[in-house]
């Protein structure tokens, strides 16, 4: 599966996070995803910031089935065969700005089989790409808390307003992340058991439902507080779900 990702607010990273989550889910279903950015900007900084937020950085080169000139020619002749399975772009961003080839807007729309439009921040443009890594990570001292903050919102939902988009719930995200990591570390000491199919399936279903990460996180919160589920089962379920979330929830195992 080929995914073309472009900047989508919060200094590029929100769009790449969406592509990352889509890739993680695709791998779970047996696909082999490749995320690329054909128009990289500030590549070194982007890769560093992606690493901080546990986002697989996009590739910046790809051998396409045809050259840019051939693409333009094909679309000029009315051929509409998508090159990419999914395109990720900022809400309102013209599709032609996502590709380094001289094709018009209708043709560019047809290059991806499906487009995901990612909302930006309430106090800036959706396609803002100029935030520094430090500005991005002011949302939380823990980069994973920034990731969690973003996942609490649907990708089409505009983040909060003010000088620090999303700051309204960054503190609660830090606290919840710390709590979950401590719980996972404590659960790891209990006898292991098969993961809860009920909660695991609910998380997977939420991802399948238009990448509804907010609903998936609510399922995990419910599992954490479910007294009827043994601790060892909670551990296995959280560990499996974290392959989708990418929050490093098992980081503190062995510390408690």
Each language-model region and where it sits:
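Structural motif
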Residues: 11, 134-145, 167-170, 206-214, ...
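Short, mixed-charge aromatic SLiMs
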Residues: 43-51, 174-183, 241-251
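N-terminal Rossmann-like or analogous alpha/beta NTP/dinucleotide-binding catalytic cores
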Residues: 1-130
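Short, well-structured alpha-helical interface segments that form or flank functional binding sites
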Residues: 17, 175, 215
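Short helix-capping/linker segments at secondary-structure and domain boundaries
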Residues: 27-33, 153-165, 227-233
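Helix-rich, typically C-terminal accessory recognition domains appended to large enzymatic cores
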Residues: 205-255
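Catalytic adenosine-cofactor/nucleotide-binding cores of aminoacyl-tRNA synthetases and other
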Residues: 75-201
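Short, histidine-centered active-site or binding-site loop motifs used for metal coordination
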Residues: 3-7, 150-154, 224
